[in-house]
C-alpha cells in the first residue's frame, strides 16, 4: 500500500511540475554525455550492506555512493533576527525548513538534474525540530511544486523521499541539527544530545527509521552531523560519560537496527572538533583517528559506514575561522599535495584502506565543497587534489551543497555560490552542468572515472568487543534469551561470529566471522570447571572455564577484573578436541601479522589462529595476581567450510 501511495504521489508531482514549469525559456540545458550522466537510473537492488571497504547491494554488487547533500530541512536561519527576513538566512536563502529549491524548480526536473550530475544517492539532512513542526510551509516555499501546498515540513520531506526513491536514488537520512537553523558553530546543535538526552535523540531516530522502513531505497541513517565542542565541553570517543560520541552512536545504531529497521546502513561520522582554537591550547579535528583503537560492533553485522568531512579552509588543527578563533595551524588548502594525501589517509582513509582489521569499513566523504566564484589559487588547488584523491581511491562521496539559488527572491544576483546546481527565480539552472563553472573539470572525472563494479566477494570480518563502561552484547540471539550473568559486565560476539581473542586487562575481546554455530539451540553459561575432562588440564594451577564438547566461545563476562563466566554456543558440526594453550598474561601471543588489528591498545592480548576456535578461558585468583583472562584454549576448526 505504501509503495502505491508513493507512486501516486510521484505521479501527482510530475503533473504538478509540468503545469507549473516556467515558460519564459527552457530551464534546463542538456547534460553533457557521460557514462554516469545518461539520464537513466543506475540499476541496483536494495537493501545495501557492506563487505570490507565496499558498500554492496542485495546481489553483492558494489554500489559506490556518488551523492549530493540536498539541504534545507535542517534549517537555513542563521540564529538571529526575523526568520521571515531572507537576510537572516544562510546566503539569503530561506529554505522554510524543507529541501531547498522547491520554490523554483519542479521536483521531476530537479531529480533529472541530479541524475545528469552523475549522482545515484542523496544525503538528506533534517532537524529534530522539523519532525515536530505542525505549521504548513508557506505556499511560496513550494511554488514550483503546488501539490505540496498545505503540508508540514515533515510531510514535504516525506514527498521528497518518495520522489527520490521512486526515481531510483538511494536516500541516506542525516540528523544534521537539533533546532531548525544553519549549522555549524556554537549554535546549540553541537552534540546529538544538545538540549535533550541521548535516549530522546535515539527515540527520534527510531521514529524516523520506522516511518520509512517500507521504502527499501531509504538505505541509511547518518546519525549526527559534525559533533563538536560547545561553549564548555568537548565530545569524546570512549570515556563513557554524557559526551561520549562513540557510546551514543552505538546506542542509537543498535536501537535503530533492533526497534525500527535492520536493513539500514548506519553512518557514524568522526568527531569534528575539540578544544579551544587558541595557539598553545589543546585543540583539533580528530575525524576518524580514534576508530583505529575503538571501533563499533553493531547488532547487525555489515551495516557500518564511517564518514568524514573535508573543506579546504579548515585543517586537522585549524577551526576554519579567520580572526577570532584562528590559529597558526595549517589549513588543508595550505598543504602540499603529499601532505594533504597523507593527512587524508591518517584522518579517514586508513579505515577503508587497511583491510582485515576490526575497524575496516567503507568511508564516505559525506561533505566537501567549494564556491563556483572561488578564484584563489590555494583553494582551487585543494579542490583539484581532493577530487583527484577521491577518484584514485574509488571513494564514496557526497558534495555539499547540491542545490542553491543564483538570484534572490527579487531576481538580483545572490544565493549560495557553493551549490553544485543553482537556480534563479525562473528555474533557470547554472552550475557544473553548464558552461563557465570551473569546477566541472574536477567534478566530471570524479563521477565518470570507472571504479570497482560488480560482485564483491565476502571476506573474513573482525569485530571488537569492549566492556570499558557497559555491556557489549552484539548478539540478537543472546539478547532474546535474557541476562545470562546478572550484575557482571558482558560481551558477546555478533551472530555469525566466534570469539577469537581476549585482552589480559581492560576487558576487550576480538571476534571473527564464522558459520560454526548451530541454527537452533541456545547457549551454555560456564561458571566452573565441570566441562574440563579428566586428564585434560590445559592450564595447571589456573581456573578454567571450558565449553562443553561440541561448543565454542562466543562471549565472556567480568566482575571488575575477575572472569565471571564464559558463554558457549553449540556447533553445527562435530568439533575437534585437543588443541593448545595460548598464554597472554605476560605478553602478547597472537598470530603473525595480528589479524583483526590491535583490539586492546596498551594491553597484553591472546588470540587463536584463524584456523582455530576458542574453547576455554583460564585465569587465577591467587594473591598478588590479576584475576583477569590469562590464557585461551585454542582448538583446530573442523575444516575450511566451518571457519
Regions found by a protein language model. Name each.
Residues 20-40, 452-458, 643:
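N-terminal low-complexity, Pro/Thr-rich disordered segments
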Residues 29-121:
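N-terminal carbohydrate-binding accessory modules
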Residues 47, 90-99, 103, 195, ...:
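Extracellular glycoside hydrolase catalytic/binding regions
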Residues 68-73, 125-129, 174-178, 222-227, ...:
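Active-site-proximal beta-strand/loop segments in catalytic clefts of secreted hydrolases
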Residues 94-122, 130-132, 138-220, 247-255, ...:
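An active-site-proximal structural segment forming one wall of the substrate-binding cleft
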Residues 375-460:
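Aromatic-rich peripheral "rim/lid" segments of glycoside hydrolase catalytic domains that contact
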Residues 458-643:
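Lectin-type carbohydrate-recognition ectodomains
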Amino acid at each position: 500500500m505504501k509503495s502505491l501511495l508513493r507512486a501516486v504521489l510521484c505521479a501527482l508531482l510530475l503533473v504538478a511540475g509540468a503545469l507549473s514549469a516556467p515558460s519564459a525559456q527552457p530551464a534546463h540545458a542538456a547534460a553533457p554525455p557521460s557514462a554516469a550522466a545518461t539520464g537513466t537510473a543506475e540499476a541496483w537492488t536494495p537493501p545495501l550492506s557492506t563487505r570490507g571497504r565496499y558498500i554492496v547491494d542485495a546481489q553483492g554488487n558494489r554500489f559506490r555512493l556518488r551523492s549530493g547533500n540536498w539541504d534545507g530541512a535542517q534549517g537555513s536561519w542563521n540564529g538571529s533576527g526575523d526568520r521571515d527576513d531572507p537576510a537572516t538566512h544562510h546566503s539569503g536563502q530561506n529554505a522554510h525548513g524543507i529541501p531547498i529549491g522547491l520554490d523554483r524548480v519542479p521536483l521531476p526536473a530537479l531529480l533529472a538534474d541530479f541524475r545528469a550530475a552523475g549522482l545515484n544517492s542523496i544525503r538528506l539532512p533534517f532537524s529534530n525540530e522539523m519532525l515536530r513542526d505542525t505549521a504548513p510551509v508557506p505556499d511560496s516555499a513550494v511554488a514550483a511544486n503546488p501539490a505540496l501546498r498545505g503540508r508540514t515540513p515533515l510531510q514535504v520531506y516525506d514527498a521528497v523521499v518518495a520522489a527520490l526513491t521512486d526515481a531510483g536514488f538511494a536516500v541516506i537520512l542525516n540528523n544534521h541539527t537539533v533546532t531548525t537553523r544553519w549549522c555549524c558553530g556554537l549554535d546549540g546543535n553541537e552534540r546529538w544530545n544538545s538540549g535533550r538526552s541521548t535516549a530522546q535523540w535515539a527515540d527520534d531516530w527510531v521514529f524516523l527509521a520506522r516511518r520509512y522502513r517500507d521504502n527499501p531505497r531509504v538505505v541509511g541513517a547518518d546519525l549526527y552531523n559534525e559533533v563538536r565542542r560547545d561553549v564548555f565541553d568537548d565530545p569524546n570517543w570512549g570515556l563513557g560519560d554524557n559526551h561520549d560520541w562513540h557510546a551514543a552512536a552505538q546506542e542509537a545504531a543498535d536501537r535503530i537496527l533492533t526497534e525500527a529497521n535492520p536493513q539500514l546502513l548506519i553512518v557514524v561520522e568522526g568527531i569534528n572538533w575539540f578544544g579551544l582554537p587558541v595557539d598553545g591550547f589543546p585543540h583539533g579535528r580528530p575525524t576518524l583517528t580514534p576508530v583505529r583503537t575503538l571501533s563499533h560492533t553493531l547488532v547487525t553485522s555489515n551495516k557500518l559506514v564511517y564518514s568524514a568531512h573535508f573543506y579546504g579552509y579548515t585543517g586537522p588543527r585549524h577551526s576554519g575561522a579567520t580572526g577570532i578563533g584562528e590559529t597558526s595551524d595549517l589549513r588543508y588548502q595550505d598543504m602540499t599535495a603529499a601532505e594533504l594525501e597523507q593527512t587524508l589517509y591518517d584522518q579517514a582513509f586508513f579505515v577503508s584502506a587497511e583491510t582485515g582489521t576490526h575497524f575496516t569499513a567503507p568511508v564516505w566523504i559525506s561533505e566537501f565543497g567549494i564556491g563556483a566564484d572561488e578564484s584563489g589559487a590555494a583553494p582551487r588547488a585543494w579542490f583539484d587534489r581532493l577530487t583527484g584523491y577521491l577518484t584514485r581511491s574509488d571513494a564514496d562521496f557526497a558534495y555539499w551543497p547540491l542545490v542553491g539559488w543564483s538570484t534572490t527572491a527579487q531576481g538580483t544576483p545572490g544565493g549560495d555560490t557553493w551549490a553544485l546546481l543553482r537556480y534563479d527565480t525562473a528555474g533557470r539552472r547554472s552550475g557544473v552542468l553548464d558552461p563557465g563553472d570551473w569546477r566541472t573539470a574536477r567534478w566530471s572525472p570524479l563521477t565518470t572515472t570507472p571504479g570497482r563494479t560488480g560482485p564483491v566477494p565476502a571476506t573474513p570480518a573482525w569485530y571488537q568487543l569492549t566492556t570499558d563502561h557497559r555491556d557489549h552484547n552484539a548478539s540478537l540471539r543472546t539478547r532474546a534469551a535474557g541476562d545470562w550473568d546478572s550484575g557482571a559486565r558482558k560481551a558477546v560476539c555478533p551472530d555469525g561470529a566466534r570469539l577469537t581473542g581476549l585482552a589480559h586487562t581492560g576487558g576487550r575481546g576480538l571476534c571473527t566471522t564464522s558459520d560454526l554455530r548451530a541454527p537452533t539451540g541456545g547457549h551454555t553459561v560456564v561458571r566452573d570447571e565441570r566441562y574440563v575432562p579428566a586428564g585434560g588440564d590445559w592450564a595447571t594451577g589456573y581456573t578454567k572455564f571450558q565449553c562443553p564438547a561440541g561448543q565454542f566461545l562466543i562471549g565472556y563476562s567480568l566482575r571488575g577484573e575477575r572472569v565471571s563466566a564464559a558463554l558457549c554456543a553449540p556447533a553445527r558440526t562435530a568439533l575437534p578436541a585437543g588443541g593448545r594453550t595460548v598464554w597472554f598474561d605476560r605478553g602478547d601471543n597472537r598470530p603473525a601479522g595480528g589479524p583483526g588489528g590491535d583490539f586492546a591498545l596498551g594491553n597484553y592480548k591472546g588470540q587463536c589462529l584463524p584456523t582455530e576456535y576458542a574453547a576455554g578461558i583460564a585465569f587465577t585468583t591467587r594473591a598478588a595476581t590479576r584475576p583477569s583472562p590469562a590464557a585461551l584454549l585454542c582448538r583446530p576448526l573442523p575444516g575450511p567450510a566451518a571457519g
